[in-house]
Design a protein with these regions (language model features):
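N-proximal low-complexity "stem/linker" segments adjacent to membrane-targeting elements
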Residues: 1-27
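Short, acidic, metal-binding catalytic loop of nucleotide-sugar glycosyltransferases
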Residues: 27-36
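A conserved acidic beta->alpha catalytic loop
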Residues: 42-52, 68
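Acidic donor-binding loop at a coil-to-helix junction in glycosyltransferase catalytic cores
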Residues: 174-183
Length: 229
């Protein structure tokens, strides 16, 4: 598929209890060199609906609010299905608490359009945010941290992959702890996948992070990562 014709870009962003991070994520999407056509935000969990945090941005946001906790895989599958129904051709899996450089979407589409169904990058920056200080590591590699073999929030894929992923996420036999494990173990092996060397993302570790809050509490030297150098 040509990168300039018949493209409809859909982004799904799960969010929980962090309206300030979600607003930042949507602002980053609006700053992309290739803006998405639809941003499907899924607020999952207890608490008040915070759609107000992006209401003034005039962004193409579809807001879904699930007032009670649901299975982890449905947190991703629900907005993914909406984007499929909206006839999207290119899909982006984004987390509300990561940083996306302005060329992220454009870079991913360029890589998918050379013949891949799925792309992910193991190269990224890492920001450890601890008040009142922070650590920034511009060169890190996600080799074994995530099941996908890269930074999960850097994933992008085509419609055939999206349909297969939706089916896999809805399979009760694939009851892994995290949705990206389902993707890595069951969906990726059936498609043409690219492990990109492009760095268009920064992974954010903060006190509320489910997967990396321990970095905030530790005096880390990033033994979990390999340097690009």
């Amino acid at each position: 598929m040509s990168s300039t014709q018949n493209i409809r870009i859909g982004v799904f962003v799960p969010t929980f209890n962090r309206p300030e991070l979600l607003r930042s994520c949507v602002l980053q999407l609006l700053a992309q060199t290739r803006r998405p056509d639809i941003i499907c935000v899924h607020q999952n969990g207890e608490g008040d609906n915070y759609a107000w945090c992006v209401a003034d941005l005039h962004a193409p946001v579809v807001w879904m609010h699930t007032p009670a906790r649901i299975p982890q895989n449905d947190w991703y599958r629900t907005p993914l299905n909406h984007l499929i129904q909206e006839d999207c051709t290119h899909f982006f899996w984004m987390d509300h608490d990561d940083i996306y450089l302005a060329n992220h979407i454009e870079t991913c589409i360029g890589e998918l359009d050379i013949g891949y169904d799925f792309r992910i990058s193991k190269h990224c920056g890492v920001l450890i945010s601890r008040s009142p200080a922070f650590q920034y590591h511009p060169h890190a590699r996600f080799d074994d941290i995530h099941a996908t073999g890269g930074m999960s929030a850097s994933m992008a894929f085509t419609l055939p992959f999206a349909r297969a992923l939706s089916t896999d996420l809805g399979n009760p036999e694939f009851n892994h702890v995290f949705a990206d494990e389902v993707l890595a173990r069951h969906t990726m092996p059936r498609f043409r996948c690219l492990h990109s060397t492009q760095k268009t993302t920064v992974y954010l570790s903060h006190a509320s992070s489910l997967s990396s809050a321990h970095w905030v509490r530790e005096d880390t030297t990033f033994h979990e990562f390999r340097s690009d150098a």
